[in-house]
Amino acid sequence: MKIVEVKHPLIQHKLGLMRDHDISTKRFRELASEVSSLLTYEATADLETETVTIEGWCGPVEIEQIKGKKITVVPILRAGLGMMDGVLENIPSARISVVGVYRDEETLKPVPYFQKLASHIEERMALVVDPMLATGGSMIATIDLLKNSGCTSIKVLVLVAAPEGIKALEEAHPDVELYTASIDKHLNEHGYIVPGLGDAGDKIFGTK
C-alpha cells in the first residue's frame, strides 16, 4: 500500500494548531478544511492531463485539462463532512458519495448504517475522507462497500493516522493509497489516537 505522510510546513503548522485542547469549534472546522485542501493537492498530483485547444482572448490557445476517470468525494459520516469542502475547493466538479459508518465505543467495531453513492461509481476515482484513521475499522468497511459497488480506484485522505489503523488498512486493502498529515504514536486503551486530535467529530460539529 502506498503511504504518504505529507510533511509540508503549511500542513504541519495547521495540524499543530488543531491539536490545541482549547481550540474553538469554528477554528478547528476551518483548519480541517484547509488541511484537507492541501492533502488533496498531494493526492491528485498523479492525475493524467490532456492538451486541448480553446479560444483565448488572442485566438486559439492550448491548455492542460485533467483527463480520465471522474472523481467522487466520499466523506464517512459524520466527521468526514468536515473535510469535504476542502477537497471540493480543488475539485468543484467532483460528485459526492456519502457513507455512514460509526464505531461502537465498547467493541470498537464498525457499524454501517447508510450509503448513497454517486452514479457510475465503477468509473470514478474515490477520495475517501475521514479525519482519523484509528483502528481502521470504519475505513475498511467503507472501502469494502465501494469495492462491492464496482469502484476500483480508491485513495484515502485522513488528517492523522495511528500505526495500528495503517496496518489494518494495508492488510485489508493493499491496493489503496493513503495520504495523511501525520502518522501519530499509537492508540490508547479506548481506541483514540495519541497524541491525535481528540474527538474530531465533536470538535467539528460542536457536540462535546
Swiss-Prot record:
Keywords in alphabetical order: Allosteric enzyme, Glycosyltransferase, GTP-binding, Magnesium, Nucleotide-binding, Transferase
Gene3D superfamilies named in the record: 3.40.50.2020
Cofactor note: Binds 1 Mg(2+) ion per subunit. The magnesium is bound as Mg-PRPP.
Pfam families registered for this protein in UniProt: UPRTase
UniProt key word DNA repair: no
GO molecular function, one term: magnesium ion binding
UniProt cross-references to HAMAP family, sorted A to Z: Upp_B
Protein name listed in UniProt: Uracil phosphoribosyltransferase
